[in-house]
């Protein structure tokens, strides 16, 4: 007999400076993912715009701002652009492995390099090895660390050039956090490749969506998500197709991923 479903208790954080939009404040509503129903709860909350961080599911709940918009790629209809096709070909030799969610020194070293290059002043800049281990290993759901390695003769472990902490949900893959070698001279577009690879693998597995988190109006750091089509956004009336404006498309073209 299955355990009875317990309706979760939700809490709201105190206002804090927004890490994405200068001069704004943010609040989050959150709940704990625990017990036998953690997977079902995470799936249900994911469909209404929540994200997972360790054993907590959260979403923005800002009083005077609605810039954060949940977005997901429709995997079976994914139509890569010409530049995305080139990126897929360029990196198609990478060896992809879905690893158990155990943090390694090699992954952490890659993360430190990525943060120093792309987000030196971001909220994760001071993340130490224990913080990283907590991010990866404290999961009550079906999570994997997807590793991207360069091929080597003989089939051994090649150089690690990319990672993505990924949850498998009932209706798709949720990309929790990805990082990669941002200075590899021969691997341009690794961030784009990791997302596109997730979308193609989801489609092959019969999973309809890949959840990318929040597209944030006015944030250049999140503009790249608009490059993956077709894209759906979550609004007051549910999920609908997201058609970026011409200016948003231009911003997406130039933001690195």
Curated annotation (Swiss-Prot):
Keywords linked to the UniProt accession: Acyltransferase, Cytoplasm, Transferase
EC numbers for this chain: 2.3.2.29
Xref: SUPFAM superfamilies: Acyl-CoA N-acyltransferases (Nat)
A GO molecular-function annotation: arginyl-tRNA--protein transferase activity
Catalytic activity field: N-terminal L-glutamyl-[protein] + L-leucyl-tRNA(Leu) = N-terminal L-leucyl-L-glutamyl-[protein] + tRNA(Leu) + H(+); N-terminal L-aspartyl-[protein] + L-leucyl-tRNA(Leu) = N-terminal L-leucyl-L-aspartyl-[protein] + tRNA(Leu) + H(+)
Cellular compartments annotated: Cytoplasm
Main location: cytoplasm
Alphabetical GO biological process terms: ubiquitin-dependent protein catabolic process via the N-end rule pathway
InterPro entries associated with the record: Acyl_CoA_acyltransferase, Asp_Glu_LeuTrfase, N-end_Aminoacyl_Trfase, N-end_Aminoacyl_Trfase_C, N-end_Aminoacyl_Trfase_N
Record GO cellular component, one term: cytoplasm
One Pfam family in the UniProt entry: ATE_N
Role this protein plays: Functions in the N-end rule pathway of protein degradation where it conjugates Leu from its aminoacyl-tRNA to the N-termini of proteins containing an N-terminal aspartate or glutamate.
Family named by the database record: Belongs to the R-transferase family. Bpt subfamily.
Identification of the protein by name: Aspartate/glutamate leucyltransferase
